[in-house]
Amino acid sequence: MNDETTPANKNPEKAELRCGWTTGACATAATKAALTALITGEFPDPVGIILPKGEVPYFQLANEGLGEGYAMAGIVKDAGDDPDVTHGATIISTVYPAPPGTGIIFRAGEGVGTVTREGLAIPPGEAAINPVPRRMMTEICEAICAEYGLPADLVITISVPGGEEIAQKTWNPRLGIIGGISILGTTGVVHPFYCSAWIHSIHRGIDVARAAGQKHVLGATGSTSEDAAQALYNLPDFAILDMGDFAGGVLKYLREHPIDRLTIAGGFAKLTKLAQGALDLHSSRSQVDKGFLWQIAERAGAPADMKERILLANTAMEVLELTQSIGIDIAGPIALEARQTALKTLRGAPVEVEIIVTDRKGNILARV
């Protein structure tokens, strides 16, 4: 899970899906509005910002506050049609002057996390506001201050009411980001059902594990297989990667950033797709090949009269149950083939790979 990809609201089958805005873009727009009001006494509404790729979105203000030595503005995040747990959250920026020569200081307010572990893009002790949003806010503040002939010595506090609860639906607690969500985004735009944010979360998890000197990490396709593997190893939270369907996101990053040992745990159907060579295991992007399963079953000793039943089976689990009913093990060969796919993808990187196949109840069917 991660802030901008965990399913929350929409249907991927809908045509012409609408893009939205990242928490970083919302924080930047809120900061621009707050700083403008701090200097002029007036809030721009709507407030426009220039994103890294040149887009110029405008944001309506949901909150305004102007007091002695501070200004505050809030924007409700619209993630478009992306299934995003931060959709509808209010991103608030409070800006006030800092001592001369201080520059721009970022602080985590209510609902924004604080980094506590090495390995992330932001050092421990700092607000979980990622580098691109920091740069966007810094540049816009420097430009506004220069326009009015003022030094850009400011404290910017970003808050998200309810953010601590939202963060429990993300990978932040396992990454060592405590107290709330992260302020994220590299382009400012949320593309519906786009995989980059989720894969970035996987990469952050590997970075944290490496920085902690962790030698063994786990990537699971879901909570059932994760629990089964954890019953064996009891790894620390930060050693559990946010893999889900993105086996390729794990393996390709480990190729360049190796960790000694990787355990991939998953249900039979998901790992059948990995065994077939698929690296994205989502049902809309890869399917179980019943012909492949028949080949596996035939090599394991299944009789010829079972071929048609396997080819006509509705699900991979039905095939598994058919073979189990006559004492044929296909989970073991699937695990071996999945391991070969993983090793091929790693391209010789020094990573030992283990595969654990589970059933729907979390029973281990194969471990190689």
Curated annotation (Swiss-Prot):
Swiss-Prot/TrEMBL keywords: Cobalamin biosynthesis, Methyltransferase, S-adenosyl-L-methionine, Transferase
Protein name per UniProt: Cobalt-precorrin-5B C(1)-methyltransferase
UniProt pathway annotation: Cofactor biosynthesis; adenosylcobalamin biosynthesis; cob(II)yrinate a,c-diamide from sirohydrochlorin (anaerobic route): step 6/10
GO BP terms: anaerobic cobalamin biosynthetic process; methylation
Presence of the UniProt keyword S-adenosyl-L-methionine in the record: yes
E.C. number(s) listed in UniProt: 2.1.1.195
Catalysis: reaction(s): Co-precorrin-5B + S-adenosyl-L-methionine = Co-precorrin-6A + S-adenosyl-L-homocysteine
Major enzyme class: transferase
Similarity field: Belongs to the CbiD family.
Domain of life the protein comes from: Bacteria
Single GO molecular function: cobalt-precorrin-5B C1-methyltransferase activity
